[in-house]
């Protein structure tokens, strides 16, 4: 049977209000009374109900995190950053997996609010106008992590994805490549069509190189789609000599697909990935990759959310963290 605040009050011979003050750390309790209540709580095994406490304090010290795919290394690292900062500031986490499904994302958002969370960290590859309208209506603060929305109405923590793509392609151009392909994630997602593709094209254009539509191949973030993409690119009359890939997992597929065709990476084909996940060091040759600081994005997003929840001063609601390229053996 669950022990209630009433049971604690009765056993300790104090009022329920006194038990509540002790549980919530209110200093207006005599030390002897506090000691007696805490001993009773320990003896009975009482566990305060966060939601019930929230009804009184209007805070549950709980944060909702909506994540597209917890099995993905990228999002798992983000979640670690979120949780570490949440723990530091004494918040609990409710984590929900949306499977990158818009209807499920909106359902989870409303579900989180029903649990009376104090704030929400939201991640999605495709933040639509409908998302923005729902997020704006949220009664608690919301911060986007590694997710973009074009209006900048929702606070967010990201990197400059367009510039990161530009830098990756520019490094291949600087190595002498003229035939550079791009294997993208799902093109309907703004992070790809509005950012990474734009950076890829800008690097080529500014260097006076042609932009070939056939050199832009859409994948679905999986290893298999990387294999399929490189097979398609190697059918081109003028084959690419370098490929920029939108994620590390697809890049592994590109490397293995090229090797299956008898090509040597990097002598015949140089490859750069994106995200610098652990996968980049698990392949041979090891993968050169754009470093997106996943843990830091999660940590900074959680810290930004704590500022909003506690009504602290926020210098900027749109935070962009620095990126860099980690050069390994898939490039010369």
Swiss-Prot record:
GO terms for molecular function: DNA-binding transcription factor activity; transcription cis-regulatory region binding. Residues 5-24 bind DNA. Residues 1-57 form the HTH lacI-type domain. It holds the Pfam family LacI. PROSITE patterns: HTH_LACI_1 (PS00356), HTH_LACI_2 (PS50932). Keywords: Activator, DNA-binding, Repressor, Transcription, Transcription regulation. SMART domains: HTH_LACI (SM00354). It comes from the Bacteria. InterPro entries: CcpA, HTH_LacI, LacI/GalR-like_sensor, Lambda_DNA-bd_dom_sf, Peripla_BP_I. Gene3D superfamilies: 3.40.50.2300, lambda repressor-like DNA-binding domains. Global transcriptional regulator of carbon catabolite repression (CCR) and carbon catabolite activation (CCA), which ensures optimal energy usage under diverse conditions. PANTHER family: ARABINOSE METABOLISM TRANSCRIPTIONAL REPRESSOR (PTHR30146:SF150), LACI-RELATED TRANSCRIPTIONAL REPRESSOR (PTHR30146). This is Catabolite control protein A. The gene is ccpA.
